[in-house]
């Protein structure tokens, strides 16, 4: 399909720079194909679901993946900004760096805050390899838990570029950009639909008879990358690591066999569930990378409803929601959201999308 079909104009004023408080006070647009759009709030979610529905959240935890440093021996040069995007092993990370042209293979970068170092010593990394578009492979002097601790001490919250370009990240973001479910460290971007949940909403869902399940997909920085090719078939999707336990898969399959719907909280949960789905719609345990790219024409096998934020034009995520509800339906929904003052992107409002039962 032509990428331009997924383009739309979004006023800069629609981009949320802070979340609302409390989190479940965010607005939520309910989209049912063939039905009138409903303007609701996230706290209405229990009333919009049915007893027996299965809510699936992503429990990944965002790491402090934004590092600042300088090349050793080049103190007068501009600082090096590195965003860790993918763990390769116990001591190596793939990263996006700026300015990448300043780095060569073999260079050593010392990371810290204005020359300070973490308690474990200097956090140094050697540039092992350079790729396209600012990608490098960094080999750190620390390994395993020691490296994780050093990154946590020296790093900052890796806010999306559409927020970080408008304001400086601060300590509040360390809390705001983490879901209440965050448990397994490894993401460099938040599963943003989960940001809307509160203990009160969780309790109300349980009282409604909705069961909550957890999976893990470590969201990568590729989630922010626009589709630059003219045809979606030519786009190469980024890979992310995810796991679904056998117990979770069995519980979801049993509930669905009894008529319960699977409701994915976020596109990350949906992508992992669909990656693990068999042809008959049952879900298998999963522990692997997924690079699933969902565009209109995709046959959904596992997910019946999706709660998700509002996404970027020409993004793989807007393509995904267009596949879920139909391109024309989502174009109309986004026009309504923009005209009605909904807040977009990571800190913005939510949508609750239902697909046609016949396509189950």
Curated annotation (Swiss-Prot):
Gene3D superfamilies: QueA-like. GO terms for cellular component: cytoplasm. Keywords: Cytoplasm, Queuosine biosynthesis, S-adenosyl-L-methionine, Transferase. One of its GO terms (biological process) is tRNA wobble guanine modification. Pfam families: Queuosine_synth. It is an enzyme of class 2 (transferase). One of its GO terms (molecular function) is S-adenosylmethionine:tRNA ribosyltransferase-isomerase activity. Transmembrane segments: none annotated. Its main location: cytoplasm. Coiled coil: none annotated. Pathway: tRNA modification; tRNA-queuosine biosynthesis. Monomer. Belongs to the QueA family. PANTHER family: S-ADENOSYLMETHIONINE:TRNA RIBOSYLTRANSFERASE-ISOMERASE (PTHR30307:SF0). Transfers and isomerizes the ribose moiety from AdoMet to the 7-aminomethyl group of 7-deazaguanine (preQ1-tRNA) to give epoxyqueuosine (oQ-tRNA). This is S-adenosylmethionine:tRNA ribosyltransferase-isomerase. The lineage of its organism: Bacteria, Pseudomonadati, Pseudomonadota, Alphaproteobacteria, Hyphomicrobiales.
């Amino acid at each position: 399909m032509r990428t331009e079909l997924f383009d739309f104009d979004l006023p800069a004023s629609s981009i949320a720079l802070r979340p609302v408080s409390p989190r479940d006070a965010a607005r939520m647009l309910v989209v049912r194909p063939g039905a009138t759009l409903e303007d609701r709030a996230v706290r209405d979610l229990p009333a919009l679901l049915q007893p027996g529905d299965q809510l699936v959240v992503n429990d990944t935890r965002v790491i402090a993946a934004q590092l600042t440093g300088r090349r050793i021996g080049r103190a007068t040069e501009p600082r090096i900004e590195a965003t860790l995007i993918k763990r390769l092993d116990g001591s190596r990370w793939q990263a996006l760096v700026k300015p990448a042209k300043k780095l060569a293979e073999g260079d050593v970068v010392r990371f810290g805050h204005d020359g300070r170092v973490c308690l474990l010593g200097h956090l140094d990394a050697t540039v092992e390899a350079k790729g396209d578009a600012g990608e490098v492979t960094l080999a750190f002097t620390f390994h395993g838990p020691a490296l994780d601790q050093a990154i946590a001490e020296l790093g900052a919250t890796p806010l999306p570029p559409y927020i970080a370009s408008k304001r400086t990240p601060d300590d509040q973001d360390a809390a705001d950009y983490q879901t209440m479910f965050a448990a397994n460290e490894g993401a460099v971007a938040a599963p943003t639909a989960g940001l809307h949940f509160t203990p009160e909403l969780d309790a109300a869902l349980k009282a409604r008879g909705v069961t909550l399940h957890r999976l893990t997909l470590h969201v990568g920085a590729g989630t922010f990358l626009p589709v630059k090719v003219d045809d979606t078939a030519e786009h190469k999707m980024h890979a992310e690591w995810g796991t679904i336990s056998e117990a979770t898969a069995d519980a979801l399959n049993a509930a669905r066999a009894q008529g319960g719907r699977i409701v994915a909280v976020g596109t990350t949960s949906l992508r992992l569930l669909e990656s693990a789905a068999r042809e008959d719609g049952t879900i298998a345990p999963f522990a692997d990378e997924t690079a699933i790219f969902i565009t209109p024409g995709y046959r959904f096998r596992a997910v019946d409803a999706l709660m998700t934020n509002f996404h970027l034009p020409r993004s793989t995520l807007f393509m995904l929601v267009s596949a879920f509800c139909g391109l024309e339906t989502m174009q109309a929904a986004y026009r309504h959201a923009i005209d009605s003052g909904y807040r977009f992107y990571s800190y913005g409002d939510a949508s609750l999308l239902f697909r046609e039962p016949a396509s189950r």
